[in-house]
Regions:
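Glycine-rich nucleotide-binding loop
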Residues: 51, 73, 105-111
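Glycine-rich/acidic phosphate-handling loop/turn and adjacent ATP-lid/helix
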Residues: 62-86
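Short beta-to-alpha transition helix within the HATPase_c
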Residues: 1-3, 7, 57
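Glycine-rich ATP-binding loops of the HATPase_c
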Residues: 96-107
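Short beta-strand/loop element within the Bergerat-fold HATPase_c
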Residues: 49-61
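Hydrophobic/aromatic residues in the conserved F-box-adjacent beta-strands of the Bergerat ATP-binding
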Residues: 11, 54, 65-67
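Conserved short strand/loop->alpha-helix "switch" segment adjacent to the catalytic nucleotide/phosphoryl-transfer site
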Residues: 5-36, 40-50, 80
Length: 114
């Protein structure tokens, strides 16, 4: 499923049917919202042109979520606004007993396993 916002930013969602308990679903929803919001605010340098992709896969009650954009990548010295949002993401990942990895490769890529 791909949604296009302002005719310039496309969000593609690729997932199987997944079923989460509320203690996991709420943090995952907040994590996705925060990371997509960060992409909208910081990844595209104000030109509002880009792609955001969200992939959630499941195998044997384990989940892997990848959120990536094709923006400028994560800055070496992030602003306080960015770090506050990512700190929230880190806390929520710990809350669901997950692991978070981030890297820059043609944009930002966040891998979350839980």
């Amino acid at each position: 499923m791909t949604e296009i916002y302002n005719n310039k930013i496309a969000i593609e969602i690729n997932t199987n049917d997944i079923y989460l308990d509320v203690e996991t679903a709420i943090p995952i929803g907040i994590i996705i919202t925060e990371l997509v919001s960060n992409s909208f605010k910081h990844a595209f340098n104000g030109n509002n042109l880009g792609n955001i992709k969200i992939v959630i896969k499941t195998k044997q009650n384990k989940y892997k979520m990848i959120l990536q954009d094709n923006g400028v990548g994560f800055p070496e010295t992030p602003s306080k606004k960015v770090t506050v949002g990512l700190e929230l993401v880190s806390i929520l990942v710990l809350q669901i007993n997950g692991k978070l990895k981030h890297r820059n490769k043609h944009g930002s890529i966040y891998n979350i396993s839980f």
